[in-house]
C-alpha cells in the first residue's frame, strides 16, 4: 500500500509502454482479464478474509451461547462450555458454491484465482440501507451525482473501471458516515473519482482539472483533504472487483478461443458496450445495492444471452440471480426502446481500447422511464397471480453462435 505522501504525486508509466514497468500495479490495465485476476494485494486480502471468517464464526458462537459468562473458565467449572448444541455447526457453510468457469491458466491455478475473486467480493461489501444514515439526502441525489461523474469521465476520456471504482468508493464511504448534507455530495463524488483515476489511469487528469469541473464548488485543497478522509474511512481498501470487471471476465470466458491466450480480449466491443450501458443505467438506481457486483453483471449478461451461457461463464445458478434479473427488467426495456448506442471514437484512444472508455448517455431520462415501468410491473405482479416482466432470451436455434445478441 502506498504511503500518503506518495499517493498524491506519484507518476505512472506512459500509456502504451510495455515491458516490466507496465506491470508495476495490477490496476493499470483495463481490458486485460489477467489484470483483474492478478492482485498484488493478495496476501492482504487473505488476511482480511481470515479475519472476516473469524468474525463470522464468533457471531455464530454468540448466537448459540446466549450467556457469555458460560465461556469464562472458573475454579469450580470445566473450561469447556456445557450444554452447547454443536449441531448448529453442521450446516455452517463458509465456502462459495460457485463453480469456476475459468479455463486452465498457464500462470496460476484457476481454482485459486477464482477463490481469490470470490473472497474479494465477499470482503468488499456495501450497505444497501446506508441512506437511512443520512435523513437529509434522497436517492435521487445519488443518481444525479453518479450521472454527473459519468459525464466527467467521458469528457476526460477516463475508463469505465475508473468510474465504477469511484462509484464503489462513494457508496462504501457513505455507509461509514452519518448525517451527510447534500452540499458535501459533490466534493465526496469528485474526490472518489480523483482517487480512482490515480489508481486506474496511466495519465490521470491533474488536480486542478478535477476542481475545474465542479465550477468552483470544490477547491483543490478540499479535494485533497476529502481524499484522505475517504481512504481512511475505507481503511485503505481500494481494490474491489467492480461490476464492469466481472462483466469483462464473463465476456472473455464466453468468447474464449483456444488459439489465443486468455490474457487477450476476444469479445466484440459493440456487445460489451451494450451490456455496459445497461449496467450504467442500473447503477444509478439505489436498488442496485441489493445485489453483489457479480450478480449484477451476470444478470445484465442474461438479458443479452441465455440462462445457459450465464451459468457457464459466471458459475451462478438461475435461482441465485433470478431476483436481480427480474429487478433489471424495466431497465432493459428502457434501453431496448431507445436502442443501444454505437461504439464511440475518441481522439488519442487506440481502436482496441474504445469500449473501455466510459460514456455518458441520456441516463436520467432513461432512468425515469425505467422507474415508471418498474412501478407498472410491480402493480401487475401485485394484482396478478402469475409473475410478469422477465425478458425471455431467444431460443437456442435463433441465437448467434457466440450466444450473445446485440440490440
Swiss-Prot record:
InterPro entries linked to this entry: Cyclin (IPR039361), Cyclin-like_dom (IPR013763), Cyclin-like_sf (IPR036915), Cyclin_C-dom (IPR004367), Cyclin_N (IPR006671), Cyclins_cyclin-box (IPR048258)
Gene (name only): CCNE1
Keywords: Cell cycle, Cell division, Cyclin, Nucleus, Phosphoprotein
Superkingdom of origin: Eukaryota
Known partners and oligomeric status: Interacts with CDK2 protein kinase to form a serine/threonine kinase holoenzyme complex. The cyclin subunit imparts substrate specificity to the complex.
Protein's name in the database: G1/S-specific cyclin-E1
Stored PROSITE patterns: CYCLINS
A GO MF term: cyclin-dependent protein serine/threonine kinase regulator activity
One GO term of the biological process aspect: G1/S transition of mitotic cell cycle
One Pfam family named in its UniProt record: Cyclin_C
Amino acid at each position: 500500500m502506498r504511503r500518503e505522501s506518495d499517493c498524491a504525486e506519484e507518476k505512472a508509466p506512459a500509456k502504451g509502454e510495455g515491458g516490466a514497468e507496465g506491470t508495476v500495479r495490477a490496476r493499470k490495465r483495463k481490458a486485460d482479464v489477467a489484470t483483474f485476476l492478478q492482485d498484488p494485494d493478495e496476501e492482504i486480502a487473505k488476511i482480511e478474509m481470515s479475519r472476516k471468517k473469524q468474525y463470522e464464526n464468533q457471531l455464530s458462537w454468540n448466537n448459540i451461547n446466549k450467556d457469555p459468562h458460560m465461556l469464562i473458565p472458573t475454579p469450580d467449572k470445566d473450561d469447556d462450555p456445557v450444554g452447547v448444541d454443536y449441531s448448529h455447526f453442521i450446516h455452517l457453510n463458509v465456502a462459495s458454491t460457485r463453480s469456476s468457469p475459468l479455463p486452465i491458466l498457464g500462470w496460476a491455478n484457476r481454482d485459486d484465482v477464482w477463490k481469490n475473486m470470490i473472497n474479494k467480493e465477499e470482503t468488499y461489501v456495501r450497505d444497501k440501507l446506508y441512506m437511512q444514515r443520512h435523513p437529509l439526502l434522497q436517492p435521487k441525489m445519488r443518481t444525479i451525482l453518479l450521472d454527473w461523474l459519468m459525464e466527467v469521465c467521458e469528457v476526460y476520456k477516463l475508463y469505465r473501471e475508473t468510474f465504477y471504482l469511484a462509484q464503489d468508493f462513494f457508496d462504501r464511504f457513505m455507509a461509514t458516515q452519518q448525517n451527510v448534507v447534500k452540499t458535501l455530495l459533490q466534493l465526496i463524488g469528485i474526490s472518489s473519482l480523483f482517487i480512482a483515476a490515480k489508481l486506474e489511469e496511466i495519465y490521470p487528469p491533474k488536480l486542478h482539472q478535477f476542481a475545474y469541473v465542479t465550477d468552483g464548488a470544490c477547491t483543490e485543497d478540499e479535494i485533497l483533504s476529502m481524499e484522505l478522509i475517504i481512504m481512511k474511512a475505507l481503511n485503505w481498501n481500494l481494490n474491489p472487483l467492480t461490476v464492469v470487471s466481472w462483466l469483462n471476465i464473463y465476456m472473455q470466458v464466453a468468447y474464449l478461443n483456444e488459439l489465443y491466450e486468455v490474457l487477450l480480449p476476444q469479445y466484440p466491443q459493440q456487445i460489451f458496450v451494450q451490456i455496459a450501458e445497461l449496467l450504467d443505467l442500473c447503477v444509478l438506481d439505489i436498488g442496485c445495492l441489493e445485489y453483489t457486483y457479480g450478480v449484477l453483471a451476470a444478470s445484465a449478461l442474461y438479458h443479452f444471452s441465455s440462462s445457459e451461457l450465464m451459468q457457464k461463464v459466471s458459475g451462478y445458478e438461475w435461482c441465485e440471480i433470478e431476483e436481480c434479473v427480474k429487478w433489471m427488467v424495466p431497465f432493459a426495456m428502457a434501453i431496448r426502446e431507445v436502442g443501444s448506442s454505437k461504439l464511440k471514437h475518441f481522439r488519442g484512444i487506440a481502436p482496441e481500447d474504445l469500449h473501455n472508455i466510459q460514456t455518458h448517455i441520456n441516463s436520467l431520462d432513461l432512468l425515469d422511464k425505467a422507474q415508471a415501468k418498474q412501478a407498472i410491473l410491480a402493480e401487475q405482479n401485485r394484482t396478478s397471480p402469475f409473475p410478469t416482466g422477465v425478458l425471455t432470451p431467444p431460443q437456442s436455434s435463433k441465437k448467434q453462435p457466440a450466444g450473445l445478441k446485440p440490440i
